[in-house]
Amino acid sequence: HEAVAEQRVHAGQEHVVRALTNALDSGRVHHAFLFTGTRGVGKTTIARIFAKSLNCERGTSAEPCGECNSCRDIDAGRFIDLLEIDAASNTGVDDVRELIDNAQYMPSRGRVKVYLIDEVHMLSKSAFNALLKTLEEPPGHVKFLLATTDPQKLPVTVLSRCLQFNLRRLEPGQIAAQMTKILAAEQIGAEAEAIALLARAADGSLRIEEGRRDPADD
């Protein structure tokens, strides 16, 4: 559901999309980005779309085609030059050292090697130190996309080397609209009143509501 995912991002995070679009259009893309915000506001979705923008076979663009092999492989989670690490489950320095050791090598397929580290604040202190060394002298072919729900726990040395984007909590109306689109795409009927109730209870996060919708309830 890439179209739905991208609609979800654009619905509440236009300020982030606009800044990233300007960077891509100008050809001046920073080496490290930090996306902050609560769960379910589109942090990793934006990061994956950005990875496609950098590696689309039709050229670097704010609007990747979504159809070439690179775009399809990124969507499917099998693009060799997009490395995703969930710091919540990989906090050891060995994982990050391995990641950093590989950063020096040129991309295998794409133009840019992209590292997406989710919940980056959960890395250990030694892991942060290993990451910091690469952020201080980043290879030109590498981009770091860091995401966190708790930026206060990040070392200042890491924060200072990243462009930061705070993703806003979604308004109930935005959540309801996106839920309606998702349900329609999956051909699932739902009452507008029920959607509105869930949207108000979501507290700004769409992911939670996607998780609550159980097909067994249909």
Task: Report residues per predicted region.
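Conserved AAA+ ATPase "SRH/arginine-finger" region at the nucleotide-binding site
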Residues: 86-88, 164-175, 188, 200
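A general alpha-helix detector
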Residues: 6, 161, 178, 193-197, ...
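Conserved AAA+ ATPase "sensor/coupling" helix adjacent to the nucleotide-binding pocket
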Residues: 99-103, 118, 161, 165, ...
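Short, surface-exposed acidic/glycine-rich loop or hinge patches that mediate macromolecular interfaces
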Residues: 40, 90, 149, 169-170, ...
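Conserved C-terminal helix/linker of AAA+ ATPases
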Residues: 210-218
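A short helix-loop-helix "switch/interaction" segment in the helical subdomain of ASCE P-loop NTPases
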Residues: 184, 193-207
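P-loop/Walker A NTP-binding region and its immediately flanking N-terminal helices
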Residues: 1-164
